[in-house]
């Protein structure tokens, strides 16, 4: 695979946990992280994504195809 991949992040505020929860949908239901601020949640998700990509490449597994999701405001 060549070129830069752009993966989705779904970021939601959790009133119960008082944190932002981030899901990485292309990577399955277990690909989640969180942060106490929006910026921290995004940074944590970027770290998780880097680990997922590195792990898949190391194991010789194909990377999931990026998907397009509707944007909401």
Give the location of each predicted region.
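Short glycine- and Lys/Arg-enriched binding-loop motifs that mark or flank ligand-binding interfaces
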Residues: 26, 31, 56
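Short, charged, surface-exposed hinge/linker loops at domain edges
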Residues: 1-8, 39, 43-73
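Short acidic, gly/pro-rich beta-turn/loop elements at beta-sheet edges
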Residues: 19-21, 32, 43
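Short aromatic-glycine-(Arg/Gly/Cys) micro-motifs in beta-strand/loop hairpins
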Residues: 12-28
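Short, positively charged
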Residues: 3, 10, 14-17, 35
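A short, exposed loop/beta-hairpin motif centered on an aromatic-Gly-Thr core
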Residues: 29-40
């Amino acid at each position: 695979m060549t070129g830069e991949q752009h993966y989705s992040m779904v970021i939601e505020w959790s009133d119960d946990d008082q944190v932002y929860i981030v899901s990485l949908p292309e990577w399955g239901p277990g690909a989640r992280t969180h942060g106490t601020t929006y910026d921290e949640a995004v940074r944590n998700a970027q770290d998780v994504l880097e680990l997922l990509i590195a792990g898949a490449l190391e194991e010789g597994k194909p990377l999931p195809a990026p998907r397009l999701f509707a944007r909401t405001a």
